Design a protein with these regions (language model features):
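A short acidic, glycine-rich active-site loop
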Residues: 13-21
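Active-site-adjacent substrate-binding region
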Residues: 22-90
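Gly/Ser/Thr-rich active-site loops/lids in small-molecule metabolic enzymes
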Residues: 8, 61, 65, 105-112
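Single conserved hydrophobic/aromatic residue that forms the stacking wall/gate
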Residues: 1-7, 11-12
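His/Asp/Glu-rich mid-to-C-terminal helical/loop segments that flank catalytic regions of hydrolases
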Residues: 93-131
């Protein structure tokens, strides 16, 4: 889970709260070679427990975990706004997560900036989004 960029096909809060990413936006984002596809788990806690992490991976097949995406996905879903999540993963969600976050926070920023610029260009030139 560390120092990578994930384009999330879905955001999973628990079995009842699963938000699918917009397929067109996800396809456009995943055209960038610096992005890997995955499932994003999300919750109201900083994931540092290895057993809890293993449980999320086994139950939901997640690639990464964060604390914000479910709220954003929920608002988008309720308002009918296409949703996509691109995440810079900064730690392995284990007992060393706090230290890893500090060390790796800037490692993927340039790549994420490039992915976003490329995605915005693809969105603006994608006929399927404008017709």
């Amino acid at each position: 889970m560390s120092a990578s960029l994930v384009g999330s096909e879905m955001c999973i809060r628990d079995r009842e709260w699963v938000y699918q990413a917009d397929k067109t936006l996800l396809r456009l984002a995943l055209a960038h070679p610096g992005l890997q596809e995955g499932k994003l788990g999300t919750g109201d806690f900083f994931l540092t427990d290895v057993d809890r992490k293993r449980d999320y991976i086994e139950r939901f097949g997640i690639t990464a975990f964060d604390m914000e995406t479910a709220a954003i996905a929920s608002v988008c879903h309720k308002c009918g706004i296409p949703f996509i999540c691109l995440r810079k993963i900064s730690d392995d969600a284990d007992d060393s997560a706090t230290e890893q976050y500090r060390e790796m926070n800037e490692r993927a920023e340039d790549t994420l900036t490039n992915v976003l610029q490329d995605l915005f260009h693809r969105i603006l030139t994608e006929d399927a989004l404008w017709n």
